[in-house]
Amino acid sequence: MFDELLFFSDNRPVKRFWFIALVGIFCAQSLFTLADDSLKSLLPVFGKPLKAAKLPKAALPKAQVELGRVLYHEKRLSRDNSIACNSCHDTVGYGVDGKKFSLGFEGHLTGRNSPTSFNAFMHLAQFWDGRAPTVEEQAKGPILAGGEMAMPSAEAVVEKLGKIDGYEALFKKAFPKSKPAINYDNVGKAIGAYERLFVTPGRFDKLLAGKNKALKENEIRGLKKFITTGCVACHTGNLLGGNSYQKLGVINPWPNQKDQGRFDLTKKEADKMFFKVPSLRNIAKTGPYFHDGSETKLEAA
């Protein structure tokens, strides 16, 4: 039930992680095997299998990834030098911090649960409300958010980085055509380049690739149930989510009505309580669940 994967992280080029395959968590009724044609016919809804990311060989993107790695772990990107991207999206914690709400500047609690940064660049958009189109744009948001890293302005970020030994050289190497090399857009571009290595393939992908013994029998039963009960209507594609917005509280009103989801961004009545559907990759390790962290147990979620 556990798969080994390779993942680029921290101060080492490669770090090993173990994660629980999504499909192993679900219960089911009757026995199905991969010889079952009905199951095989349903698998195309998940698309092509994920493939592990590789460090770029070309000098320029490699330099951008290296700069992004440093910036991702740089606490001095926060106003009080205490919070980095990695604080809430921990690369040794499956891209999350495991908290209902993350701690921001001066102990402020963020209003939403921190989603995993793993595989995030493949989502249709970033943040629970989709307000950033790419991980490069997303990376620039929390740094300036008052309740998160709380830097007063993009200019203040650039000035601060310019005074730290080593950054001038790293930025010039990563962005040789930029004048000046240290600018706020390049901060986002570098962090995004690093995050684009956060790909976590596993046994489920072996199944999608046609390897009949990739999953155990109970996992196959769970997958069959997952598909036939309609979970796949929202959690679809090879990320099992991350590619649509859906409404919470369709049958009964969602208990937390303070956060109106995409409505707070678009001001469109039709967007009330719509949130991005999270990916179920590594889901057993990325709780608590939902945008408000309201459920701690996966079975209940």
What does each model-identified segment do?
Residues 2-8, 13-65, 123, 141, ...:
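Post-cleavage N-terminal segment of exported redox proteins
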Residues 36-141, 203-301:
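Short glycine/threonine-rich turn/loop motifs
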Residues 147:
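Central I-helix of cytochrome P450 enzymes
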